[in-house]
Amino acid sequence: MYKITWDKETGGVLLHSRIVEGTLGISPRPVFFEELDLLGLDKLGWTYPHVEEPIMWAVNKQYWYRGVRLFDAKGANIYTKPTLEIQPGIEPMELVPVDVKKMLQRTSDLMFVLENEAIEFIRDTYLAYAKANKTYNKADANKLDFETMAERVEKKSKQRMAVVKQDCDSFDIMPLATAEKEGKRVLLSTKIDRFIASFSGGKDSQVVLDLCTRAIPPTDFEVIYSDTGYELPPSLALYKDVEAYYKKKFPSLRFLTARNHESVLNYWDKIGTPSDNHRWCCSVMKTAPLYRMLKVEGNKQARVLTFDGVRAEESVRRSGYNRIGKGVKHSTVINASPILFWSSVEVFLYLFRYGFPINIAYRRGITRVGCIICPFSSEWNDMVVNHTFHEELEPFLSRIEDNVKRNKVQDFRNYIEDGNWKRRAGGRDIHSSSAIDFLSSKPDLNVMLIKPQKHPLTWISAIAPFTGSEKQGELKYRNEVYSYKCENNGDVYSLSFKNTAKSLALQGLIKRALNKATFCINCEACEVECPTGALSIS
């Protein structure tokens, strides 16, 4: 949010409300002795103390000390540490840590404004939706689905509509432009079942959690950590420390941990390694367990307002996010991002100011704390993880190596070093005994299933009402009746849906249902997208 320059006296940074001489184009990150040890700087004649304070700063892979660029790190990959390219005229020296106390004094005024604005944003957002809840519960007239109604009006009128709260303690729908002109508070939902702070073990969620405790009563929100099975060891340890700290400070604050019922490596065997095209792990290991746990009465998906640590600086995609958004990742969730416009420097300054522990992963050089392995992680982070958490990474890395070798890739090590495993687009390395073959579609849809995961008719009820048995019957779709037959010989099923060629829409739905019956592995991802609660995976 603020502009940043080096502070040569403290070895830290200064914040400015406008561009000044020496303003940095990229937000730096603090570098601690653990990272310098990993890079082997001490073996090149440099000396520095092993202390809590950072020693220097990094801008991408350039390392700066009191405003002077000392060296660059070149050529890191998952197997190989980088080489250090010392800048001309720079000789090994004794490095002095950042004077954090003085740096915090010099940045205190602007940080005070920044954090209080975030607290006010959290409080205002919480109060707006908490009051909407009270209004919603006051009268049956309020319990209409105003959000769905607004969407329908939008489609008909071809203009953006908004749900607003009126002075008479009711809701109304009006054009968004009119609502903004009249100063109405636009609501993305008329009812929130649960307020949560999402905690990941990273610095951003750590700051947001603390801001939430300063803005919202501890009885009114929950802290949820998703243990994906990919967690870095220090992230798990930090979560336990954070839980103990806040439980002591706020005994009524609830902490919950969401986990999938199955091991992530089991899913690797069934679905294949995640890739930049098939990023299944986020929905299966994180989103599905989290929102399944939050379901309310009647198996319905809870309407949730999540305070998250998303920051625009992190990626081009996130730079386009609104500070409050509905359906960003999940249809029934509103995401509120209090620190959307903060820089990583400001996040670290907050942690330093209040004496919060820094995740060990940052101290060892990881730029973004997340999963232990990820198709979107950088070669740099892959290198740091493999050299500092090798034992935890090994089961995943060995699985990748085995897959690459099995596919007879020449020079598998270079293939993995270059990150080519992350670009898997097909299912060549998935060895499944289940298969489906659509034999014909005119006039009848004839299909053969081999070793399906479910009975072929399991999902047909989601398409239309049907009567009959597992062998034959009828289904009624758009006032037309279609008969079906299902025969099986061991693990092979043959199905025929009569005269369905006259309804391509029905054939498309049947194909989806049969595909799901063939390959469904109970990952739970579909259940949390069901808006009515009719779908349940067990």
Region locations from a protein language model:
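Short Lys/Arg-enriched alpha/beta "domain-start" segment
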Residues: M1-L38, R428-Q507
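Local cysteine-cluster metal-coordination motifs and their immediate loop/turn environment
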Residues: T367-W380, A517-T532
